[in-house]
């Protein structure tokens, strides 16, 4: 999932910090996803999908 998130960051020239500020998802949560310390919760996935204008399924492919 984080790979897809990283692709979207690159495509949109955003940083994880910007996404955190814009969505209210804590940077520590994004960092935990990157390191595989925690699983992505559905509500957060929905927020990210809406933010980037993609479907939830995009992250699950």
Can you name each region flagged by the protein language model?
Residues 1-15:
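A short, Lys/Arg-rich alpha-helix, primarily the initiator
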Residues 9, 20, 49:
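The alpha-helix within a helix-turn-helix
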Residues 25-39:
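Recognition helix of helix-turn-helix/homeodomain-like DNA-binding domains
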Residues 61:
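Phosphate-coordinating loops and pocket residues in cytosolic domains that bind phosphorylated ligands
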């Amino acid at each position: 999932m984080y790979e897809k998130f990283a692709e979207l960051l690159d495509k949109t020239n955003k940083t994880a910090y910007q996404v955190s500020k814009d969505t209210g998802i804590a940077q520590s949560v994004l960092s935990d996803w990157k390191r595989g310390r925690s699983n992505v919760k559905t509500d957060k996935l929905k927020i990210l999908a809406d933010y980037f204008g993609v479907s939830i399924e995009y992250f699950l492919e």
